[in-house]
Curated annotation (Swiss-Prot):
RCC1 repeats lie at residues 94-156, 159-210, 212-262, 264-338, 339-392, 394-438, 439-492. Gene3D superfamilies: Regulator of chromosome condensation 1/beta-lactamase-inhibitor protein II (2.130.10.30). The keyword Repeat applies. Residues 20-34 have a biased composition (Basic residues). It is a peripheral membrane protein. One of its GO terms (cellular component) is nucleolus. Interacts with RAC1. Interacts with CORO1C. Residues 309-316 are annotated as: Required for interaction with RAC1. The gene is rcc2. This is Protein RCC2 homolog. Keywords: Cell cycle, Cell division, Cell membrane, Centromere, Chromosome, Cytoplasm, Cytoskeleton, Membrane, Mitosis, Nucleus, Repeat. Its main location: nucleus. GO terms for molecular function: small GTPase binding. Multifunctional protein that may affect its functions by regulating the activity of small GTPases, such as RAC1 and RALA. Required for normal progress through the cell cycle, both during interphase and during mitosis. Required for normal attachment of kinetochores to mitotic spindles. Required for normal organization of the microtubule cytoskeleton in interphase cells. Interferes with the activation of RAC1 by guanine nucleotide exchange factors.
C-alpha cells in the first residue's frame, strides 16, 4: 500500500471505506448482464440483442417497463443553429509510449483465437513490466486511448496524427481492412487531419479533430458509429452524421457512443439496451417469432432530460445542466457538469451508478454525494463495472465493483489507500486499476491478471490493495490508459534524466506476419 501523509483530512468522505454487504446488494434480484466479463465467455465479441431488421432513428416505441417517467415541466429547446468555429487543443503532455500487459490481441477475453485469426495464434505475449515500442523511437506521443472492454488502442502524436494497433476483426483500427496490427501504425487516410482526442469501444472507435469533427470506424451493427445505418463493419474512417455545434469530447461504451458539443449539450447513439443512451427507454421490443430486439439510435440524438430523486422517491427535473466531461463503462455512462455535479445512468448492476440500488436508470440521474458545497467533482472515470470520481478537494471516490465475484460498493466511498495523493490520471481495465498521482504510478487488481499492473517479472502478479509500480520509479506518467488486459502510459521525457530512465526499460519488438 502506498503511504503518504494525509493532506486533506477534513475533506468529504474520509470515513472508513468498507465494501457494502453483497447479500444486501443482491437483494433486488438484479441478474448479471450477459455482456459482463466472464472467464469462460468471449467477452469482447458479445453484442447485445439481435441485429434483426432495419430499425430506423424515428422508430420510437416509448419508455420500456420500469423506465423513468419524463417530468412534464421540462421544456426542451434544440441547440443554436449558428455553428461556431473552434480550434481544440489536445493534451499538454508529451512523451514516450510505454506498454505492459497482454499483447496477443486476438486472444484477449477469449478462450481461444477464432479460426479466421488462426495465423496470429502464437503472436504476442504477456509483458509483466513496462516496455518501449522499438518502432516508436523518436515519436513524441501526446495522448493514448483504449477501453475497459477493448483489445485495440490508439495514440495521438504531438503533431496530431492518429496511429492504431491491436485487434481488428471489425475494422476498428481504421486502415481499410480487418488485418490485425501488432505495432502502432499511422492511419494513412487521416494523415491530413489534426486529432486531439479518441475513444475505443469493444470493437469500434471514435476520433475527434481539432475543428470539432468526429470520425468513426469499426463495428456498427448496433449503430454505434452514428452513420445512419447498421452496416456490420466499417473498416475505413467516416464522419458521423451530425450537423450541430462542434464536438469537444467523445466517449465509447461497449456498443454505444457519446459526444459532447462546445455548448455543453450531450448526444448519444448505438445500443440502448439498459437505458445507457439516456433517452428514457431501453429500446426493447418484441419482433418476429417473439424475439427481443432493440430500437438502436443510428445517428446522434440529444439527451434532454436530467433528473434527481428525493428520499421519498419523488422525481424532479434538474435544469441548466451544461456538460463538461463524459465517461462510459461497458453499459453505463457518467457526466460531469459545469456545477461540478455528477450524473449516472444505464445498467445499475453491482452499484456502478452510485444510487444505493441496482436499478437501471433510463435518463441521467444526479449522484447525491457530489451535490453539496465543497463536495463537487473535478474528474470522472468509468470502468467496466465501476465508477470513480475525484472531488474538488482531491479525494478519490469509488463505487460499483472491480471484481464482480466479491462485494459491491453501492454508493461513492473514499478510496482510503489514496487519501492525500493528487490524482491526475486514472484508468480501468477488465478488473484492474492504474493511477498516476504525484510522482508515482499506482495500480491494483485481483487475479487473474496478464501484466497490466506492471509489477515486473518474478513479482506478484496481482494485488487487492493499491501498490506503487516500482518498475516506473523515477518515471513521471503524464497519462495512463487501460484496455481490457493491457496498460499504456505516456511517460515524460523532457529532461536528460527522464530520457536516461526510459532508456533502461526493455524494448518490445513483436513478431509480425
Amino acid at each position: 500500500m502506498p503511504r503518504k501523509k494525509v493532506t486533506d483530512g477534513s475533506g468529504p468522505g474520509n470515513g472508513a471505506a468498507r465494501p457494502a454487504n453483497r447479500k444486501k446488494a443482491a437483494a433486488s434480484g438484479k441478474k448479471r448482464s450477459r455482456h459482463e466479463f466472464s472467464s469462460d465467455e468471449d467477452d469482447l465479441d458479445g453484442s447485445p440483442g439481435s441485429d434483426g431488421g432495419f430499425q430506423g432513428h424515428n422508430n420510437k416505441r416509448g419508455p420500456a417497463k420500469g423506465a423513468t417517467k419524463a417530468p412534464t415541466a421540462v421544456i426542451v429547446t434544440e441547440p443554436e443553429h449558428s455553428k461556431e468555429k473552434i480550434k481544440l487543443e489536445g493534451s499538454k503532455a508529451k512523451g514516450q509510449l510505454l506498454i505492459f500487459g497482454a499483447t496477443n490481441w486476438d486472444l484477449i477475453g477469449r478462450k481461444e483465437v477464432p479460426k479466421q485469426q488462426a495465423a496470429y495464434r502464437n503472436l504476442g505475449q504477456n509483458l509483466w513490466g513496462p516496455h518501449r515500442y522499438g518502432c516508436l523511437t523518436g515519436v513524441q506521443v501526446r495522448s493514448v486511448a483504449s477501453g475497459s472492454c477493448a483489445a485495440h488502442s490508439l495514440l495521438i502524436t504531438v503533431e496530431g496524427k492518429l496511429w492504431s494497433w491491436g485487434r481488428n476483426d471489425k475494422g476498428q483500427l481504421g486502415h481499410g481492412d480487418i488485418k490485425r496490427i501488432d505495432v502502432p501504425k499511422l492511419i494513412e487516410s487521416l494523415k491530413g487531419e489534426v486529432f486531439v482526442h479518441a475513444a475505443c469501444g469493444r470493437n469500434h472507435t471514435l476520433a475527434l479533430t481539432e475543428n470539432g469533427s468526429v470520425y468513426a470506424f469499426g463495428e456498427n451493427k448496433m449503430g454505434q458509429l452514428g452513420l445512419g445505418n447498421k452496416t456490420d463493419a466499417v473498416p475505413s474512417p467516416a464522419q458521423i452524421l451530425y450537423n450541430g455545434q462542434p464536438i469537444t469530447k467523445v466517449a465509447c461504451g461497449a456498443e454505444f457512443s457519446m459526444i459532447m458539443d462546445c455548448k455543453g449539450n450531450l448526444y448519444s447513439f448505438g445500443c440502448p439496451e439498459y437505458g445507457q443512451l439516456g433517452h428514457n427507454s431501453d429500446g426493447k421490443y418484441i419482433a418476429r417469432a417473439q424475439r427481443i430486439e432493440y430500437d438502436c439510435e443510428l445517428i446522434a440524438r440529444r439527451i434532454a432530460i436530467f433528473i434527481e430523486k428525493t428520499k421519498d422517491g419523488q422525481i424532479l427535473p434538474v435544469p441548466n445542466v451544461v456538460v463538461r466531461d463524459i465517461a462510459c463503462g461497458i453499459n453505463h455512462s457518467l457526466i460531469l457538469d459545469s456545477q461540478k455535479r455528477v450524473f449516472s445512468w444505464g445498467f445499475g448492476g453491482y452499484g456502478r451508478l452510485g444510487h444505493s440500488e441496482q436499478r437501471d436508470e433510463m435518463v441521467p440521474r444526479l449522484v447525491k454525494l457530489f451535490d453539496f458545497p465543497g463536495r463537487g467533482a473535478a474528474q470522472i472515470y468509468a470502468g467496466a463495472t465501476c465508477s470513480f470520481a475525484v472531488s474538488e478537494m482531491g479525494g478519490l471516490f469509488f463505487w460499483g465493483a472491480t471484481n464482480t465475484s466479491r462485494d459491491s460498493t453501492m454508493y461513492p466511498k473514499a478510496v482510503q489507500d489514496l487519501c492525500g495523493w493528487k490524482v491526475r490520471s486514472l484508468a480501468c481495465g477488465k478488473s484492474s486499476i492504474i493511477v498516476a498521482a504525484d510522482e508515482s504510478t499506482i495500480s491494483w487488481g485481483p487475479s487473474p491478471t496478464f501484466g497490466e499492473l506492471g509489477y515486473g517479472d518474478n513479482k506478484a502478479k496481482s494485488s487487492t490493495t493499491a501498490q506503487e509500480v516500482k518498475t516506473l520509479d523515477g518515471i513521471y506518467s503524464d497519462q495512463v490508459i487501460m484496455g481490457n488486459s493491457h496498460t499504456l502510459v505516456v511517460a515524460r521525457d523532457e529532461t536528460e534524466q527522464d530520457k536516461e530512465k526510459l532508456k533502461k526499460l526493455p524494448e518490445y519488438n513483436p513478431r509480425t506476419l
